[in-house]
């Protein structure tokens, strides 16, 4: 009672008409419902807690809490004791049991069906059924609260430009200690923009990606009209062109597909792919080209296996196979690298067949915001001994043609990416993109960083110094925000102290992993009815999925089968080259890259 009275008094002191739920009084995922104008009630149903604010654990919950290790303890165990994990990885039933626990414990943190969106902070049919919205992990802060974060902090948030300049902008490039490379950085950017497709004409809370998951619309197009323009309608294949004996995407002129290119780009360099923004940087077009080649390769395999099949069945089955390949690569290569675990992750949909699991997904606005990993980007891009700055690199597909995919893969495999957590590692070229992320979070009325930590079962920070793990940035944040409980979600993710020798801090992993794994395993192809050889054209197609890796994808589609992975293998290869490239421009010297990045690709 005392705690409740104090929270209400604080709200009333700041605003006589404050919504009683502004103080976020309901804990442990309890739901706050206003009762009259100055009272509230917490719905603790199925939370495992009871009491006025859902703070008293039930008996079984109390036991679970006593036995459950902290996220950092779990991370330590999984990233140490390599010898033990090598043994576990070889014992199938143990590996399966642990992987099943990883999948269920993470994915159960995501509400399914979805619950809220920017306009509905309560359960509603509109929030459930309207696919044009991103869903929300936490409801928006009520409109009638005394401060932007509810009752904590100042009445106005700090200037977003100041936040970016003081704690986010790079002073000096900080390489990722996990050895993450640019093959990873561009894979992340390419992969996620099949479902991060904000409809900025309607606002940051809306999406054009109505499938809300891994549908490969960045390869095939979001609409049927776009897909048809990109298809060859022969043997299931996508349109392509041959340049120097190698397959590349067709041009905008040949397909009449809408793409975003500045007027300075020559027609023959305006490649057309599923995602309209992928002309932005050659790294994205590299992956677009690789997946185009893979689709057409799989079509050839299926055509040989099923000469009786027509174009449509070859196309549709190849698409399902590529979805399977993507999910396997993301879990076993991409997430495996990010985790730093010695435990070997496994893509096996059958692990969940006897579990309570819903094969549907809805992309959350917070997941989109969380995935703004711009500190990965280097200051320059090093390709085959040449150096390209941002102005030379963006909207310049001639770089891809000049060097070819083999050199791109080799060079990006060797070049180290930046560390995401720890602050002050954001490239100046994307300063405006980062500012826009903060502004859009405010427009969508995100709750505070600490509220999101509680949402994902992580203890809230008690001070800025605990958040950053140092004193200088902590003091800057203290001056900007005044209260750790008023710290914003997005900048906090980037300034949070990294885990030891890791790319991310605790919250990025604990909040990001549930969204990621639920989205991957919630795909229809992972369901019992779909996950069988016949869905993928028989054992041949099923094998393509079950043997997929980032290395096999490259070997099947890039001349010479260059070695690749998502981390730099030899630290001696990360040294900076000093040769300055002046060739391969496309008349873009007079274009400000930061303006283009802001106007055309706020999400990228």
Swiss-Prot record:
Pinpoint the site Aspirin-acetylated serine.
Answer: 516
Positions carrying S-nitrosocysteine are 526
Q: How is the cofactor bound?
A: Binds 1 heme b (iron(II)-protoporphyrin IX) group per subunit.
| Pathway where this protein functions | Lipid metabolism; prostaglandin biosynthesis
Q: Which residues form the signal peptide?
A: 1-17
Keywords of this protein's UniProt record, alphabetized?
A: Acetylation, Dioxygenase, Disulfide bond, Endoplasmic reticulum, Fatty acid biosynthesis, Fatty acid metabolism, Glycoprotein, Heme, Iron, Lipid biosynthesis, Lipid metabolism, Membrane, Metal-binding, Microsome, Nucleus, Oxidoreductase, Peroxidase, Prostaglandin biosynthesis, Prostaglandin metabolism, S-nitrosylation, Signal
Q: Which domain of life is it from?
A: Eukaryota
Residue ranges of domain EGF-like in the record = 18-55
Q: Subunit notes for this chain?
A: Homodimer.
Name of the protein this chain belongs to:
Prostaglandin G/H synthase 2
Recorded source organism is Bos taurus
